[in-house]
Amino acid sequence: KNKNITLNWYPIGTGPFKLTENNPNLRMVLRKNSNFRGEVYPSLEDKIKNNKLYSKNTEKVIPFIDEAIFSLEKEQIPRWNKFLQGYYDNSGIASDNYDQAVSLNSSGDITLTDELKEKGIHLSMATAASTYYIGFNMLDGIVGGKSNRAKYLRQAITLAIDYEEYISIFANGRGIVAQSPIPPGIFGYQDGIKKYNKTAYELKNKRIIKKNIEKAKILMGKAGYANGIDQENGKPLILYFEATGSGADTYSFLNWLRKQFKKINIQLVTRVTDYNRFQEKMINGTGQIFQWGWNADYPDPENFLFLLYSKNGKVRYSGENA
């Protein structure tokens, strides 16, 4: 640990590729593992007989390529432009490029624009088994801990942040407000219809709606921060948000987030840093509020719920729970 020899920097595995270049701030390179045991691409027609797998795709031996290069682009617009110029093989569609990339056909379905079709670009759409969240450092003296004061403060912030608006502005509507830690497509997912987050939502006229901002202000009062003033010392409540990135989209998000906190009279100070420094803050427990996410390693709710287990905490146990 003292020499920074960890699985993050020196991963060990038996997969089809070797990580031959590992510079997260610039690029990462995977090269074909000549010692790979050999597997074929799976098919729905594969069968198991006598505990042995019989594959249909006997000729589709993986890996299919010799090398994969992942480059870091710190801003979305340059990344998109390089994709259009052929420097990259695939790209997500950022909110700034959404109208340039897709349009609605007569049936209301999303399709690529004619310009991109002429370039031979294909559009792939799927519901990602991923979650993104704003988290609190539970070791922090203000937002963390099990006290009612901290709990009411966290709940008030949850009510103040308009995630529907976030999805509309920053994701062009491509997202679903989470009702639990489990995303769509995974067993146990709460769809916000029959099952929902009762801390932030309520049932009215057979519709599930977000609790209003007045209830957030009531929670602020119960936490001892009525009107954003700490009732113990008479000072304004100031909280800190840790962020990564340096592009215009990052600062647009941070400006929006400050306005969300301002709804309940909280002054939010945003601290932008690079991802390595951000990870250090998470590992050391020095950050206060942050945004992070998790992509499914395998389609099982355990892969998301295990993050909440206290023995998987980052600071005390070097786990994945931030």
Regions found by a protein language model. Give the residues of each.
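Structural transition elements
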Residues: 17, 143-144, 176-223, 245-252
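Solvent-exposed, polar/charged alpha-helical surfaces in well-ordered, non-transmembrane soluble domains
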Residues: 66, 77-81, 85, 134, ...
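Sec-exported extracytoplasmic/periplasmic mature domains
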Residues: 35, 84-88, 106, 141, ...
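Short helix-loop capping/hinge motifs at secondary-structure junctions, enriched
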Residues: 36-37, 140-153
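Ligand/substrate-recognition segments at binding pockets and active sites
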Residues: 24, 43, 61, 69-78, ...
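Extracellular/periplasmic solute-recognition and catalytic clefts
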Residues: 20-31, 56-57, 69-140, 164, ...
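Gly/Pro-rich hinge or "lid" segments in bacterial periplasmic/extracellular proteins
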Residues: 1-69, 77-78, 214, 218-219
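Extracytoplasmic/peripheral linker and loop segments enriched in polar/acidic and small residues
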Residues: 117-123, 127, 151-155, 159, ...
